[in-house]
UniProtKB/Swiss-Prot annotation:
GO terms for biological process: ribosomal small subunit biogenesis; translation. It comes from Brevibacillus brevis (strain 47 / JCM 6285 / NBRC 100599). This is Small ribosomal subunit protein uS4. One of the primary rRNA binding proteins, it binds directly to 16S rRNA where it nucleates assembly of the body of the 30S subunit. With S5 and S12 plays an important role in translational accuracy. One of its GO terms (cellular component) is small ribosomal subunit. Pfam families: Ribosomal_S4, S4. One of its GO terms (molecular function) is rRNA binding.
Length: 199
């Protein structure tokens, strides 16, 4: 299954969740379409699990193959599978570029990483799925510091998670530790996703 490339605001309304973290994509809290107000069908148990999976998958902008591979990796780790899964997603380079405020949205962060604008511990990394380790430092390449998209995003940043620190003078952030569950998206019930893949 390929990555969704259609209108994200329509997808957000269909899933009932903000995909970009701003809430602007879900101002109208009902599904798109002529009968959106009356189109909230009662979902089966499978439908509820599937919808939860789709929420998280589209939130991070992954295709099914990438998403499932991350879940399988989480299943092999010690601890709670659902929380491990969320932590692996939060540890992605594109997500941390977004969390640190280098980009206004995850899709924008993914594109910036793809174009080679960031360094991890001083080395260029252009793989959005790169797994950042606690203690790793993410910075902007010298020749990319003048990019207006990055400058505007940093100036507009209003929140910084507790599991990252940011040096404004150096324009670099450090992933200090893996996030606790309460620091990850509260609108996601990862237990339903574990149940979906355990069917």
């Amino acid at each position: 299954m390929s990555r969704y490339t259609g209108p994200r605001h329509k997808l957000a309304r269909r899933l009932g969740i903000s995909l970009d973290g701003t809430g602007k994509d879900i101002k109208r809290n009902f599904p798109p379409g002529q009968h959106g107000h009356n189109n909230r069908r009662k979902l089966s148990e499978y439908g509820i699990q599937l919808q939860e999976k789709q929420k998280l998958r589209h939130m991070f902008g992954l295709n099914e193959k990438q998403f499932r591979r991350t879940f399988d990796n989480a299943s092999k780790m010690a601890g709670v599978v659902g929380e491990n899964f969320m932590k692996l997603l939060e540890s992605r380079l594109d997500n941390l570029v977004y969390r640190m405020g280098f980009a206004p949205t995850r899709p924008a962060a993914r594109q910036l990483v793809n174009h080679g604008h960031f360094l991890v511990n001083g080395k260029k990394v252009n793989i959005p799925s790169y797994r950042v380790q606690p203690g790793d430092v993410i910075s902007i390449r010298e020749k990319s510091r003048g990019l207006q998209l990055i400058k505007d995003a940093l100036e507009g940043r209003t929140f910084l998670p507790n599991y990252v620190t940011f040096n404004d003078a150096a324009a670099e952030g450090t992933f200090t530790r893996l996030p606790d569950r309460e620091e990850m998206p509260a609108e996601i019930n990862e237990v339903l996703i574990v149940e979906f893949y355990s069917r």
